[in-house]
Structure formats: structure tokens, C-alpha cells
Amino acid sequence: MCGIVGMVAGRDVSGLLLEGLRRLEYRGYDSAGIAVVGSDCALRLLRCEGRVQSLCALLGQSPLCGTMGIAHTRWATHGKPCAANAHPHCSESVAIVHNGIVENHRSLREMLVTRGYFFHSQTDSEVLAHLLHWELRYTAHLLLAVKKVLTQVRGTYGLLCMDAASPGRLIAARSGSPLAVGLGCGENFVTSDPLALAHVTQRFLYLEEGDIADVHRDSVCVHDAQGNVVARPVVTYQMQLCTQDKGTHRHHMHQEIWQQPHAIRHTLNAYMSFSSSSRAQVRTFGEDRVLDGTSCKTFERLFRRITRVRIIACGTSYHAGLVARYWFEAFAGVGCQVEIASEYRYRTSVVHAREIVLTISQSGETADTIAALRLAKTQGYLCAIAICNGARSTLVRESDAVLLTHAGSEIGVASTKSFTTQLVCLLVLTRMIAQAKKILTQEPEDALSAALQRLPQDVEHVLECEADVARCARHFVHAQHALFLGRGELYPIAIESALKLKEISYIHAEAYAAGELKHGPLALVDAQMPVVAIAPASPGVLFEKMASNIEEVRARGGMLYIFTDVPERFGPVCTPEADAPEGACSQIVTVPSVSPLTAPIFYAVPLQLLAYHIALLKGTDIDQPRNLAKSVTVE
């Protein structure tokens, strides 16, 4: 969500700070600001509503120069988006930027007003600036003053402070919101996301819960929650400077949809080795807790013991978990329960014997998922495993074992390749457990190996259907509402596809298990209601049931959009090229046939394209949809 960048150096930092903010734009924000301290020890501030580009324009009109500074992109939680509510917040010589929520801000505000402080914003964060200014009246030591402030605060924070009266010094504090210190030569940095500092350093130390860092040009001193000086490990984080280059694509989301064959292949290669016979050997956990190709008998023994899996996640990651429930129960013979992290935290739950907890997050910094993990670790689970794209994230560091998704940087707020690579990891983990428990017989094991080996190529082939999907979007674009239907493992894909449409096109969409049509949703169907049906040919009775549900929609005059590999089963049919009257007949997107084992991953891709092309026609901000953030780091 919000982004923090801070620097203390021997050169002007204003341009470097702005570049850091540009690199954080993908996280989502509504305002931005910068404060610097110059050689005259004067604090100078610029803030604006809107994009970093607007802040750059302001800086062009009123240049700021200084060797120490902090900057911020804000995603509104308390107070509307406007310049006054943007960070940094100042109190005379003090400036702060803050990610998180100050839960007791009202009582603190009332106290500060009685002390003569005037508030310029509606935010909870401004109280931190005034509190720090108050404490500095009694001690000139910035670190001690920050510590005193934090004893009075309830809530979460990634906090970065500076005082013009203490030049060459930044104080960073972390509780519930990530911060990292970037290490340079004669200069040091602080950020909420290392990507922001890729242009100045690749060496970082990550603050742990309760840490406070005293950052100078030539030194960094970290104190833990007990006040002890500690040495946090320094890691080198190789980041590409061109991460945000869209290439030939109009949007990052479109680029990332097309990157999925590579991302899936990369993820599979990290965990599986395929022989010429299409049989795969699954690699197991290494000593660094990451599935990296090194055999580890400890986890094989653990997997043999597992009887249940509890999946905890939010948003798109939650939908990945819903798919995995089918896999764990069908292939590995273990019960599976999927929880929304924000709900799990606040209800009484029963942990079963020999149950593991599995968290899923793209960023690894999702506040509710991290809090749920911390709760789960006190409840007696056998093990805590994370599936994550953030190799050095909080979720990764606090889990017992990790499967990295190897999706690469994902800039678009709406997750695409992160989702499909999460599903790949979940299917690999399912297979590992099934192998450890000796449940898979040779035939289904070979079928799964072959399906996974073909998956990157299958996704490449379905991307070739983009023109048909785009033509369907023309008929869809003026709709106010939409309904998505699926069965079995494809029901969660319908849920995820409805979310994608909501996120980037702002069309209200709902998803239902197709068998639930007659229990309410059928009342919504008319000639103005688009209904998207996911209908692959599948073994057993599910396909015939789905075909029957589609006929129910057709009988009510619904606008049908069918994604299938057997178009001949759904006549009368209008091809995507036809400009048929709405509701007159079905629009069919014909996709290649794939294994039912990987169909959920495969069908997610054309439905991502559908949402993208509808949003493109509507002219919305596809990469940064309104009111949304890439990484939800507050509850």
C-alpha cells in the first residue's frame, strides 16, 4: 500500500527520492510528498494529491535540495486523498512518514490539542509528528525521543523520522509494517520495498518486529524490541533496473498475462525435473527451508504424517487456496479447509491433530495473512508453510518452510502470473504429500507429470486466442453487472475471474457454482445480464451438468459467453466475429483441450484477458485501479 523512501547522503537526495517513489507507484497510492533537510538545516516540504509525476512538476517549480530526506506515497485510510493528508507530516523541525494505523489516534490528538498543537490533516499519522516534537522538548536525542513516542502508540507502523536539528540522521521503526535499510558507501537508505532503491543499492538488512534503526551516512545501528543492539543479516538483492519497462505492451497487466508461460516454466523447473519419458521427480525441501532441489528427509516424514491442511490467505491468493482444496483431497487424501485471513484471526478455530497451516501471499507482506500466521503458530499446527513471491518478505522469514512462486516482478495491481504460479506450487505440494504418503499410483502420477510438463506450452497456445476474447469484450463492455459460472475446480476460477473484472473494469460481478443457479442467481438473468460459463470437456458427469446449466441461462435470454474446448456442444452459436444482437445466441471462445489436472491454471488465462480487454474498452486505469493497492499492508 503506502510506500516509504528515505536517504541520508553526501549528495543531493531529492531526485533519488523521487525515483524511489516512481518505483513504488505499482503498489497503488492517491497522493505523494517529499521533505528534505539542506545544508542550512532547514526543513522543506512538498506534497500533492495524485501521481508522482505531479510531485515532480511541483519540484520543478520549487526545487528542493538537501542531503537528507524522506518521501512517501499514500493510500488513504484516515482522511480523504488531498495534499493536506499526504505525507510527510511535519511539526516544526520534525518530519515523519508512516505506513500502518495508529489505533489510539483520537485520544492522542485530544491530548496534543490541549498541549497547544494544531492539526492540519485528518490523518492518524500526524499525531506521530507532534508527539515526536513534544518529546524532543525534553531530550535532544532523536532515538530516545522516538522510543518514548512508540510507548504511547497502539497500532501498526513502519515509521521513518527525521529532525532538521539532527542533520545526517534518520530513525526507522517497525511494528507490523515492513521496513528495510539499504546500505551504500558513505550513504544509507530506508524503504518499505527494496525495489524503490534498486537504482542506488542492492544490499539490504531487514528490520524485524519491534526493531528501531538509527541510520547515519556511515553507520547503521539496529535495536531490537528489548532495546539490545543487534546485527541483522545483510543480504544482496539482485533487482533489474528495467523492471517497470512494459516493452511492446500497453499495460503491465497485459505484459504479465503474456509472461505466464515463462513464469510457470520457471516455477516448475525450480521444483521438478522432467525426464524424456515425461515422468517427473519432485524436489524437496532444502536446508534453507525453501524447495530448492535438495532432498530433506525431515519434510518427507512430516508429509507422511499430515492428515489435514489449513490454507489461510486473502483475495486472489484465497481463490488459489480454494482450487487447491480439490487437489489436496482428491490426490493427497488429506482434508483441506480454506480460510480468509481477516476472518480466521477473529474466530475460534479447532486445530486437528497432524494438521499443517499453509499461507499464500503474492507480496508476503499482507497484514492479515501475517497476523493469521502468527496466531496459527501458537495453536499447535505441525508446521507452517508459505507460498509467496517475495523471497525476503515477512511471511517467508516467519514460516517454517517456503515455496517461492518465481513469478518475477508483478507491477499491475491485479494479480495474474502470481495467481497461476501459486496454483503451480500448490499442485506441486499436493504431489509431494501424495508421494510421501504413497497414495498416487503410477498411472495418475504419470498423468500429472505429463500435464505439468505440457502446461507452459498449453498456456502459450491459449494466449493465441486473445483476438477472440477481445471481440467478445465488445459485446460485454456496456454491461452493469455480470455472472460467472463454474463447477468443480473451475468454480474458484469463476470467483477469481469475477474479481478480476471488478478490479479493473469496475463492473459488478458475482460468481456461483453452476449448480446453485436455481437457488437464487437465475432471478438475475435477462437479456442485459452477461453470463460467463467455464465449460471444458471433462470426465464424469460434470460437463453434462454444466451444459444443462448453460441451457437454463439460454432459456431465460441471458447473454452467454462460453469458454470451452468443445464448441460444437453449445449451439446455436455466434462466433466472436459476429455482431449478433445481445442475448440472441451464445458467444463462444474456443480454447485448446488440456488435461483436467491443470485446467484451473489454463482457464484462468483467457478470463484474465477478458477482464483486461473490457477494461481497455472502458478506459479505466488498468495497472492502478481506483482505491486498490498491490500490497495490503494494513488491516
Curated annotation (Swiss-Prot):
Transmembrane spans: none
Domain (Glutamine amidotransferase type-2) ranges: 2-218
Domain of life: Bacteria
Cysteine pairings via disulfide bonds: none
Name of the featured protein: Glutamine--fructose-6-phosphate aminotransferase [isomerizing]
EC number, UniProt record: 2.6.1.16
Catalysed reactions listed for this entry: D-fructose 6-phosphate + L-glutamine = D-glucosamine 6-phosphate + L-glutamate
GO MF annotations in UniProt: carbohydrate derivative binding; glutamine-fructose-6-phosphate transaminase (isomerizing) activity
Protein role: Catalyzes the first step in hexosamine metabolism, converting fructose-6P into glucosamine-6P using glutamine as a nitrogen source.
GO CC annotations, alphabetized: cytosol
Gene3D superfamilies the record matches: Glucose-6-phosphate isomerase like protein, domain 1 (3.40.50.10490), Glutamine Phosphoribosylpyrophosphate, subunit 1, domain 1 (3.60.20.10)
Key word Iron-sulfur present: no
